[in-house]
From Swiss-Prot:
Ranges in coiled-coil conformation: none
Protein name: UPF0304 protein YfbU
Family to which this protein belongs: Belongs to the UPF0304 family.
Gene3D superfamilies, sorted: Helix hairpin bin (1.10.287.680), yfbu gene product, domain 2 (1.10.3190.10)
Classification lineage: Bacteria, Pseudomonadati, Pseudomonadota, Gammaproteobacteria, Enterobacterales
Organism the protein comes from: Escherichia coli O139:H28 (strain E24377A / ETEC)
Length: 164
């Protein structure tokens, strides 16, 4: 992350104020203030994660994934024979915190801040699937989009989607 000295000074002052406003996280803000003031390039890359960007297309894809899981669960709930498909298979897991942190952050934002998909169970890890999921979800979306009735899926269609 490239910053001018003036930008670094402003950000340093912001962290100093946050230290006073949020004593519970003061140590974290002091650390970030030191990194900014001294210009530690390696550690400044951490800020890229905090101030990163998700393109509109990516945000829409994540919402589409969440909508697919909503449709899967609703369709599963309407099945005559729910025993043929384990409910956990139609439950949204989230994304991997280690490799898909920005996606995970967006999911948490959508649920906790925007109030969408609040019926999704975050689990003990807060939608951290603990394994990369993006490619799996892409395959699932391709199958789901090919279904003629995306919100009234048959057991066969549900199985095709979750096994994609």
């Amino acid at each position: 992350m490239e910053m001018t000295n003036a930008q670094r000074l402003i950000l340093s002052n912001q962290y100093k104020m946050m230290t006073m406003l949020d004593p519970a996280n003061a140590e974290r803000y002091r650390r970030l203030q030191t990194i900014i003031e001294r210009g530690y390039g390696l550690q400044m890359r951490e800020l890229d994660r905090e101030f990163g960007e998700l393109k509109e297309e990516t945000c829409r894809t994540i919402i589409d994934i969440m909508e697919m899981y909503h449709a899967l669960h609703v369709s599963w709930s309407n099945l005559q024979d729910q025993q043929s498909i384990d409910e956990r298979r139609v439950t949204f897991l989230g994304f991997d915190a280690a490799t898909e942190a920005r996606y995970l952050g967006y999911v948490r934002f959508m649920v906790n801040v925007e109030g969408r998909y609040t019926h999704f169970y975050a689990g003990t890890h807060g939608f951290n699937a603990q394994t990369p999921m993006w490619e799996k979800y892409q395959r699932m979306l391709n199958v789901w989009h090919a279904c003629p009735r995306q919100y009234h899926l048959s057991a066969n269609e549900i199985n095709q989607i979750i096994n994609a």
